[in-house]
């Protein structure tokens, strides 16, 4: 364990409106204008499926650099929860790490039964590429890649207010973005795309990031279950290999999700 750590922070903004002054241009956070027409259309085409997918995997930093935490939901209709992560340097010979699972309050998931799964992987080494899958009701996901840094320094991406769903009421293509439930939450659709694009740009400009610190407000809806906002938050491909240490913001704090 290194006793001296040098932290290199990278500041970024998700540009998801939040508390932006009203004087800003109406299209300031309009993903249909900022992200490229083909990429935006692909996101829109996939939104119905994405908004209903509550089983995406969340990576968070472990207690130290030798550990990595995984969390995800699994749908009970697909079988009993199997809180297992398969992890290792040989993608054809991954070691199982078992964790814990328990029922999710079904009022958060449109009345459908889900279980949460928590697993901690240990024994990570510096400057090493690993491969992993997670089990969702006994079925392994496709293989993902995770690479550690040198353990003597850490490059951190600091973000504020991803706040998926915060653009409600803003104009887009002649209509107002709304925060309705499920795929009808067009504000979450807009902001999820912007968050995905922000992380793509940030990781391209800052290769070698070790993890992200989010200062809070991962989602926007306060006091009500809005799993589609979390689906948009967890959707970016970058998050399959980039852990996030989240702070509970005021919007998150009243949300039982």
Could you tell me what each predicted segment is?
Residues 4, 18-19, 98:
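Generic signature of intrinsically disordered, low-complexity, basic-rich segments
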Residues 11, 15-19:
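Hydrophobic core
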Residues 21-25:
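Sec/Tat signal peptide C-region and signal peptidase I cleavage site
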Residues 28-247, 253-257:
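Divalent metal-dependent phosphoesterase catalytic cores across multiple superfamilies
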Residues 1-10:
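Bacterial Sec-dependent N-terminal signal peptides
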Residues 10-11, 169:
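A periodicity- and composition-biased signal for non-globular, repetitive helical segments
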